[in-house]
Design a protein with these regions (language model features):
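Short linear sequence elements within intrinsically disordered, low-complexity coil regions
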Residues: 22, 53-54, 81-82, 200, ...
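Flexible domain-boundary/linker segments
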Residues: 13-14, 20-21, 163, 195, ...
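Short, small-residue-biased leader/transition segments that mark boundaries at the very start
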Residues: 1, 5-9
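Catalytic and substrate-binding regions of extracellular carbohydrate-active enzymes
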Residues: 38-39, 46-292
Length: 339
């Protein structure tokens, strides 16, 4: 699955794209780097990854309580217990991340405005380059208030054996993306459909210590060629920080078929929450009506038939969506304005 150390978010949750499930960061690769450094006498590497491991896992290296049990024969083949140097202090998570990072080998880009566990914001963008990928175009996840607010659907409940994986979870409508004329798709699993990074601020970089390293504004602009409909798509995303505890996202998605004849460009967005209200931006009622327009029977992807409780309205006004995430302490209300 498309996960890695660089995908860590504030609560050490991994970013999700392709065949993933939401989960916490696995520190085994960090342990392997420490063991490699100890065997080969790489002191600088050992110090770097030991500090990282102690940052991610404060209990790392602490001796486990001895148990009065028989010694397993597997102990002859297991790795020796990891011993960490006590003089190496835990690093700070800010030392291992950057405001913007782009990994073209998997067509993945992340941008953030800090690492505060509650108030910082982050955007994750991905296309489909490599193995275990989905047909998702320029897909995104949004992070805020310490949660994955706009999650990627991942692999689904029944993994590869389920029909829902082939028809829905691996297809455009299950992702936060734009589907053209209801037909956007391409081969999944091993895929070679990446996006091009046109421009960004700040420049993509590995972590580097710097004063005021998180600017008040970050942005990225990427291009993707959707092969099924022969559409050119660009997505410009930005995080604007307005205060120590406040900020907002900007998402400008442009989509146009090369030869014209555009019918519809469906903007899909999935947010956490138990409730959602949809009104005009000025608060007036849109008079939503039930519809079955978005369905497989309309010559669209089968994934459209997985949508339920569908409603529609025709309007020339800006639209406002308010999601309610009910929490034990304080509810979260993501607001989205569609212009």
């Amino acid at each position: 699955a498309s996960r890695g150390l660089g995908d860590v978010y504030k609560r050490q949750m991994i970013c999700g794209f392709g065949d993933t499930h939401p989960n916490y960061l696995n520190t085994t690769p960090v342990v392997r780097m420490i063991e490699n450094a100890q065997v080969n006498g790489k002191e600088e590497q050992e110090r770097y990854f030991t500090a990282l491991l102690k940052c991610l896992d404060p209990d790392a290296g602490k001796a486990a309580a001895k148990k009065n049990v028989r010694v397993s024969i597997n102990s002859f083949f297991d790795d020796k217990p990891l011993t960490l140097k006590p003089d190496i202090r835990a690093g700070k998570i800010e030392d291992y991340v950057s405001p913007l990072f782009y990994a073209p080998n998997v067509s993945w880009l992340v941008q953030r405005n800090g690492m505060h566990p509650r108030h910082s914001l982050m955007i994750s963008l991905n296309a489909s380059e490599g193995n275990h990928m989905h047909a998702n175009g320029i897909s995104m996840e949004l992070y805020g208030k310490g949660y994955v607010l706009g999650p990627d659907a991942g692999i689904g409940l029944y993994l590869y054996s389920g029909l829902d994986y082939a028809e829905y979870y691996s297809q455009f409508p299950s992702h936060n993306t734009v589907c053209v004329d209801g037909i956007s798709s391409y081969p999944v699993m091993k895929s070679n459909h990446s996006f091009d990074l046109l421009s960004c601020f700040p420049a993509s970089s590995a972590a580097a210590a710097a004063k005021d390293k998180f600017p008040s504004v970050t942005y990225s602009d990427v291009y993707f060629r959707e092969p099924e409909s022969r559409a050119d798509q660009t997505r410009m995303m930005s995080i604007v920080t307005t205060g120590p505890e406040t900020g907002y996202y900007v998402d400008i998605f442009r989509s146009r078929k090369e030869r014209g004849g555009d019918k519809m460009h469906d903007y899909f967005y999935h947010n956490l929450g138990q409730e959602m209200t949809l009104t005009a931006a000025d608060g007036t009622d849109l008079h939503l009506q039930p519809t079955e327009e978005l369905a497989f029977a309309g010559a669209h992807l089968g994934a459209y038939s997985y949508l339920f409780d569908k409603k529609c309205a025709r309007t020339g006004k800006d639209v406002k969506a308010v999601f309610t995430i009910r929490m034990p302490d304080k509810d979260i209300h993501p607001n989205i304005i569609l212009i």
